[in-house]
Amino acid sequence: MSQLSLSWLGLGPEVAFPWQTLLLFGASWILAQILTQIYAAYRNFRRLRGFPQPPKRNWLMGHVGMVTPTEQGLKELTRLVGTYPQGFLMWIGPMVPVITLCHSDIVRSILNASAAVALKDVIFYTILKPWLGDGLLVSAGDKWSRHRRMLTPAFHFNILKPYVKIFNDSTNIMHAKWKRLISEGSSRLDMFEHVSLMTLDSLQKCVFSFDSNCQEKSSEYIAAILELSALVAKRHQQPLLFMDLLYNLTPDGMRFHKACNLVHEFTDAVIRERRRTLPDQGLDEFLKSKAKSKTLDFIDVLLLTKDEDGKELSDEDIRAEADTFMFEGHDTTASGLSWILYNLANDPEYQERCRQEVQELLRDRDPEEIEWDDLAQLPFLTMCIKESLRLHPPVTVISRCCTQDILLPDGRTIPKGIICLISIFGIHHNPSVWPDPEVYNPFRFDPENIKDSSPLAFIPFSAGPRNCIGQTFAMSEMKVALALTLLRFRLLPDDKEPRRQPELILRAEGGLWLRVEPLTAGAQ
């Protein structure tokens, strides 16, 4: 074997080649990587000095536990936003920085960045992947861009119009249930419980053309979705269980995978049946049969859509997008509508004005049903919805981790790789963005009052390339359900003030309870 003298390095006499040389090079490479990381961290820390920091709880924990997912945590966040209106820096332990942005003028650079640059924070979204696969909520890069383009037609007005009939029907079922409960002496109702089932009922009909009657009787599929949502929210608060290997060994992990399998089996069965039906009928006959029913459901659209190269979505991709829509569509809409009902219950003047607007719209109409064209004829009701979404945004925060440095409008830089939280709740409650932000005032959204506001001052559906693709669907459903509810019921606040609970969506501890009184025909 050839010999190599390393005495000039001070490493002694001749040594064997190549193993010692490879070892030296390997050690040098590792050292170089360590030094590179240390330098990058040092450089990042210097650039992060431009972001103000609240006092740390202690040197080891940093700011961990300072803003908790509780009512008190939201109050602390509101205080921080008042103190640091542009945003602030917090630390997870001694080494992990997290930037929170809470002003509409500052978030523009990140929200408008391409999906390839402003990636979703993988730590949280990874725990959704066993359930939602590579759906729009979880996927990134080229796959996300391709799916986004292919799914956009599913939310075209012509597709959404027939869904308004479904929204009416599902709301009618919920109201019939309310009247029965009230007649039995139960006028105090948990809005989250009832509205969640109503939105799931609508979604199952819009996505699968399937009626499980879930508002009146138990459904394994609906129960599995509710369980998955609860388990994901619970796991989100337990960072040690983010590791799949550990989580899968827990009782919650086993329940999660059992519920996942049930949901996947249901979706797969629907897709297989549609795949079988489509070639039997042929595309033209399939579309004719759908035209007669006047409804093309979400699965139909996904089966028929093709990309620029004429390629279809795989069955796995269709399942991922359908499951994603069921998850995102029911929770966020249920939260939004529940808090709208709460805010109007607390302000009878606004509630009555909305009611009169609906009564005038539906005067002499039989049956009392909201149609697609009606949705644009409810300006004050729409203002009330938007103000509630400002005060109680269903999604309180979104996270990004950028692949390159992001220059903010004020000249500061967010270094690549740093977790950045865009606090929707913070922006909506920022007194430098919204005067008197804790006051429910629908007139903020009067067209004259809002015309000069930043488009990023109100972002309940996010903004930019990765905004919510289903926001028109959600707004339409909320308008229909709210209009019919105010037409038939008077909403009154509960004796106990709710305590907000920001999980995956903004909930209320122990439910969001209201008292509900049916309106007589004369009162209507």
From Swiss-Prot:
Catalytic activity reported: (5Z,8Z,11Z,14Z)-eicosatetraenoate + reduced [NADPH--hemoprotein reductase] + O2 = 20-hydroxy-(5Z,8Z,11Z,14Z)-eicosatetraenoate + oxidized [NADPH--hemoprotein reductase] + H2O + H(+); 5-hydroxy-(6E,8Z,11Z,14Z)-eicosatetraenoate + reduced [NADPH--hemoprotein reductase] + O2 = 5,20-dihydroxy-(6E,8Z,11Z,14Z)-eicosatetraenoate + oxidized [NADPH--hemoprotein reductase] + H2O + H(+); 8-hydroxy-(5Z,9E,11Z,14Z)-eicosatetraenoate + reduced [NADPH--hemoprotein reductase] + O2 = 8,20-dihydroxy-(5Z,9E,11Z,14Z)-eicosatetraenoate + oxidized [NADPH--hemoprotein reductase] + H2O + H(+); leukotriene B4 + reduced [NADPH--hemoprotein reductase] + O2 = 20-hydroxy-leukotriene B4 + oxidized [NADPH--hemoprotein reductase] + H2O + H(+)
Transmembrane domains' residue ranges: 15-35
Expression sites by tissue: Expressed in liver.
Main localization, broad class: endoplasmic reticulum
Family: Belongs to the cytochrome P450 family.
PANTHER family xref list: CYTOCHROME P450 FAMILY 4, LEUKOTRIENE-B4 OMEGA-HYDROXYLASE 3
Protein name: Cytochrome P450 4F1
Organism whose genome encodes this protein: Rattus norvegicus
This protein's encoding gene: Cyp4f1
